[in-house]
């Protein structure tokens, strides 16, 4: 597919209304061609073979074959960029996170009532995510698992430095977007239980944050949770903003605390990575380490630069292992990243850089 060739999209959804609305929204963009639609995965299988789409939009819950089963088969037999269409419910959030773990690139939230008007309100986001998915590397999701890291396995530790982290010694700040739910899982899965505190921002709908925190907690030796306002930031813990709010850190004497911020979107995002990173630059400075993982757009790039200028070591995920090298690429081009690291080595480098941070 060249830049001049429209992105060929197949819509798979059991709702005729959703199929029609997505077709209308996507067809308005000259860079997209809707080549077909299917009411269930079994019909979709035949159309995929015949139409060879660049991107598939896939409803999670459908008759005849579960959307997750179909997705798993698709990614194993014919890897294709998939954008999930999911409901804004707790059950829908958990199912969508499972879909992302199986290889879906991104998702679009479907309103529970007045679906037609609701989807129209997301038209710009739908078009943007479909175009982004066409450029995504779905093969990057088949990554080998890295060994778990312990503090005595760090690469190049500072001679004589005690690898024990007190409350305010070190802080790791991470930002991610498209592809980030799985990238964050990989990173946290390989962090030791006594790692420095981690503060994170991942672009997600408000109703997804609780399920995401619970999912990460199941996969990590660290304690992963949604942050509460004023909560002390402790080693061995990782904090995410609660749904639809920014996360910042503040200094309180010899420790840091979480500050939940209900201010306006930044870079069109709420939560925004730049909000977190700028607070870390101002309040933790050289005691922090910053990282940007896979994601679309440029949120976090300027904040990471501010962290670097404040004395914090910084890194970004490399292009080869990123689903979308938007945010990491923007930070790299801005000169905000000291290192470019494959996903399977991010946890290792964060621990090593934490030991070296001043």
Swiss-Prot record:
EC number(s) on file: 3.1.1.61, 3.5.1.44
**Major localization listed first in the record, in broad terms:** cytoplasm
One of the Pfam families matching this protein, by short name: Response_reg
Where does the record place the Response regulatory domain?
A: 8-125
Cellular component GO terms held in the UniProt record: cytoplasm
SUPFAM superfamilies, per database record = CheY-like, Methylesterase CheB, C-terminal domain
Q: How is it modified after translation?
A: Phosphorylated by CheA. Phosphorylation of the N-terminal regulatory domain activates the methylesterase activity.
Function description: Involved in chemotaxis. Part of a chemotaxis signal transduction system that modulates chemotaxis in response to various stimuli. Catalyzes the demethylation of specific methylglutamate residues introduced into the chemoreceptors (methyl-accepting chemotaxis proteins or MCP) by CheR. Also mediates the irreversible deamidation of specific glutamine residues to glutamic acid.
Its domain comment says: Contains a C-terminal catalytic domain, and an N-terminal region which modulates catalytic activity.
Name the UniProt record assigns to this protein: Protein-glutamate methylesterase/protein-glutamine glutaminase 1
The protein's organism comes out as: Xanthomonas campestris pv. campestris (strain ATCC 33913 / DSM 3586 / NCPPB 528 / LMG 568 / P 25)
Question: Could you read off the lineage of the organism from its UniProt record?
Answer: Bacteria, Pseudomonadati, Pseudomonadota, Gammaproteobacteria, Lysobacterales
């Amino acid at each position: 597919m060249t830049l001049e060739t429209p992105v060929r999209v197949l819509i798979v959804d059991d709702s005729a209304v959703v199929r029609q609305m997505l077709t209308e929204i996507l067809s308005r963009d000259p860079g997209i061609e809707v080549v077909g639609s299917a009411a269930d995965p079994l019909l979709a299988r035949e159309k995929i073979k015949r139409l060879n789409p660049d991107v598939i939009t896939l409803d999670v819950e459908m008759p005849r074959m579960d959307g997750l089963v179909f997705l798993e088969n698709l990614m194993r037999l014919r890897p294709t960029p998939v954008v999930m269409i999911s409901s804004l419910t707790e059950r829908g959030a958990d199912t969508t996170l499972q879909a992302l773990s199986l290889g879906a690139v991104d998702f679009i939230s479907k309103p529970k009532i007045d679906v037609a008007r609701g989807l129209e309100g997301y038209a710009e986001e739908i078009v943007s995510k479909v175009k982004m998915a066409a450029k995504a590397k779905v093969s990057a999701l088949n990554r080998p698992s890295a060994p778990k890291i312990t503090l005595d396995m760090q690469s190049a530790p500072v001679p004589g430095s005690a690898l024990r982290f007190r409350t305010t010694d070190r802080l790791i700040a991470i930002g991610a977007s498209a592809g980030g739910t799985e990238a964050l899982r990989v990173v946290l899965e390989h962090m030791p239980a006594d790692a420095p505190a981690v503060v994170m921002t991942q672009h997600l709908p408000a109703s997804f944050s609780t399920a995401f925190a619970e999912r990460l907690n199941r996969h990590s030796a660290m304690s992963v949770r949604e942050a509460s306002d004023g909560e002390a930031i402790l080693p061995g813990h990782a904090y995410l903003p609660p749904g639809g709010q920014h996360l910042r850190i503040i200094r309180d004497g010899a420790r840091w605390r979480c500050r939940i911020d209900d201010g306006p979107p930044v870079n069109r995002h709420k939560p925004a990575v730049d909000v977190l990173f700028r607070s870390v630059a101002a309040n933790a400075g050289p005691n922090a380490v910053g990282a940007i993982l896979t994601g679309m757009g440029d949120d976090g790039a300027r904040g990471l630069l501010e962290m670097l200028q404040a004395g914090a070591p910084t890194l970004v995920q490399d292009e080869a292992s990123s689903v979308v090298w938007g945010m990491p690429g923007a930070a790299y081009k801005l000169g905000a990243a000291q290192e470019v690291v494959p996903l399977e080595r991010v946890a290792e480098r964060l621990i090593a850089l934490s030991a070296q941070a001043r």
